[in-house]
């Protein structure tokens, strides 16, 4: 068996095209164009790349994109004050603060300062709580994008044994909630998990988000399983690889996401979807 590739790049492009059409329709109807504020603190190269991609995607679909680049030395109070002003700005539907933040700024305090109806990253405790209560509104972007990828396979998720490897607030935990909502029997694995191999080998669906190249051997993948690889790791030779040993895993899986071109583009597409949702549901 050779896995079918889940083409995140193509699916994300399709989403952006639909969003662009909706923005055009809003303009023609005399409605306001959705606005996204992107805040970057410091000059971390990886963060700059991510932020650049998000700004470019905004422009492609016709959103208003406002950029706020702050110095690494920016105080927590300065950042919170900026968020307060964006919360009150009627032209802004979504506020994104690029993580991680410098050590002197508390991530959770910043996330909680963003108004829940403008939390297009889906990180605010209110929005995570809505997902946990099975009434999601603004959903965490990477898990939301992954669910779109899984749906594209046409596989019925109800009753699947799913394993999520990684328990971060950004991916692992909300991913577990998304899979529960989709009817999966879900196991979340983390650094204290025993018998990881045993759990992976019986999984119908595996989502891996640990940030370690080739962390999951391909031979662990159950024949016919769906593999979603969230990891994006740069090797010394410059090659980008995921958290799963791709070549062997692709021989066992029925569907697999490539790295790059799998989950990454979907995270940004979901961010754009959330921004339009916020405009339509909360701010029109």
Swiss-Prot record:
Task: Report the superkingdom from the record.
Answer: Bacteria
Under Pfam families, the record lists: THF_DHG_CYH, THF_DHG_CYH_C
Coiled coil, from the record:
none
The cellular component terms of Gene Ontology attached to this UniProt record, alphabetical and capped at eight, are: cytosol
- So where does NADP(+) get bound? 166-168, 232
SUPFAM superfamilies tied to this protein = Aminoacid dehydrogenase-like, N-terminal domain (SSF53223), NAD(P)-binding Rossmann-fold domains (SSF51735)
Give the catalytic activity: (6R)-5,10-methylene-5,6,7,8-tetrahydrofolate + NADP(+) = (6R)-5,10-methenyltetrahydrofolate + NADPH; (6R)-5,10-methenyltetrahydrofolate + H2O = (6R)-10-formyltetrahydrofolate + H(+)
Keyword Signal attributed: no
Q: List the disulfide bonds.
A: none
Q: Name one GO molecular function term.
A: methylenetetrahydrofolate dehydrogenase (NADP+) activity
| One example of a Gene Ontology biological process annotation | L-histidine biosynthetic process
Subunit details = Homodimer.
| Function summary | Catalyzes the oxidation of 5,10-methylenetetrahydrofolate to 5,10-methenyltetrahydrofolate and then the hydrolysis of 5,10-methenyltetrahydrofolate to 10-formyltetrahydrofolate.
Family indicated by similarity = Belongs to the tetrahydrofolate dehydrogenase/cyclohydrolase family.
> What's the protein called, per UniProt?
Bifunctional protein FolD
Q: Which organism is it from?
A: Shewanella baltica (strain OS155 / ATCC BAA-1091)
- Gene it is expressed from: folD
């Amino acid at each position: 068996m050779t896995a079918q590739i889940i083409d995140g790049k193509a699916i994300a492009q399709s989403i952006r095209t639909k969003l662009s059409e909706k923005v055009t329709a809003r303009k023609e109807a005399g409605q306001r164009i959705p606005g996204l504020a992107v805040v970057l603190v410091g000059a971390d190269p990886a963060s700059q790349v991510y932020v650049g991609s998000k700004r470019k995607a905004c422009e492609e679909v016709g959103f208003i994109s406002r950029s706020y680049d702050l110095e690494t030395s920016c105080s927590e109070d300065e950042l919170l004050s900026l968020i307060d002003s964006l919360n009150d700005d009627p032209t802004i539907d979504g506020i994104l603060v690029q993580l991680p933040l410098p050590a002197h700024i508390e991530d959770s305090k910043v996330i909680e300062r963003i108004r829940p109806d403008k939390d297009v990253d889906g990180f605010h405790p209110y929005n995570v709580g809505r997902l946990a209560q099975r009434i999601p509104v603004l959903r965490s972007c990477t898990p939301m994008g992954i669910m779109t990828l899984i749906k594209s396979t046409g596989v019925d998720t109800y009753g699947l044994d799913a394993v999520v490897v990684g328990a971060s607030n950004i991916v692992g935990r909300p991913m577990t909630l998304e899979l529960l909502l989709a009817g999966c029997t879900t196991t979340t694995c983390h650094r204290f998990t025993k018998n990881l191999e045993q759990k992976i080998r019986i999984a119908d669906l595996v989502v891996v988000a640990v940030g370690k190249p080739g962390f999951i051997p391909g031979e662990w993948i159950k024949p016919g399983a769906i593999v979603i690889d969230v990891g994006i790791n740069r090797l010394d030779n410059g090659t980008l690889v995921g958290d799963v040993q791709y070549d062997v895993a692709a021989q066992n899986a029925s569907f697999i996401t490539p790295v790059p071109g799998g989950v990454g583009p979907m995270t940004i597409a979901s961010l754009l979807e959330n921004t339009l949702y916020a405009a339509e549901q909360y701010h029109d």
